[in-house]
Amino acid sequence: MKNFVAIDFETANYEPTSICSVGLVVARGGEITQRMHRLVCPEPDYYIRRFSEQVHGIYPADTCGAPTFDAVWSEIVPWVEGLPFVAYNKAFDERVLRAACRMYGIDYTYGTFLCTLRQARRVIPRTSIANYRLPTVCAYLGIPFDRHHYALADAEGCARIALRLWGDEE
């Protein structure tokens, strides 16, 4: 697979609609061609302190005045038209995307959504790796990675994993 959009969301709280950050990395022809990161005003607009302090480092002041997801999505759509999504742990990111689209009345018609975590578990023997966390899989595959839970870094790590594990597939 050489053409896709890697996507990663960070949320402010346990609600899947509470997107506070989105990262996208577009691959075409087996090369990364575009990157996008946006802060998003979450809905509902409250933060769980642990998420801010221990997970993504995004605080209410960071998203005060940021656009809501529907405005950000209108900017994203031209990038994703006709391309499959990939995510590391797609169960989370697809649930977040579907919930936000439902909440904002956005027609969600993007069918293919693949999981690089699932593919890593299929391809990398359990005895060869300490765990299947995103930073660990990147390290195992020799992919530079830092700033875990920064949406753009996670999307880029996911994209590079997809290119490595599915790169020869059409």
What positions do the PLM features span?
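Amphipathic alpha-helical interaction segments
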Residues: R95-V96, G157-R160
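Short alpha-helix plus adjacent loop in nuclease-associated cores
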Residues: L114-N131
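Short Asp/Glu-rich motifs
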Residues: V72, A120, G157-C158
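Conserved non-catalytic scaffold segment of RNase H-like nuclease domains
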Residues: M1-Y104, Y108-Y110, N131-H149
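Short, conserved phosphate/pyrophosphate- and ester-handling motifs at nucleotide-, phospho-/glycolipid
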Residues: D154
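Acidic two-metal-ion nuclease catalytic site recognized across multiple nuclease folds
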Residues: A139-Y140, A159-E170
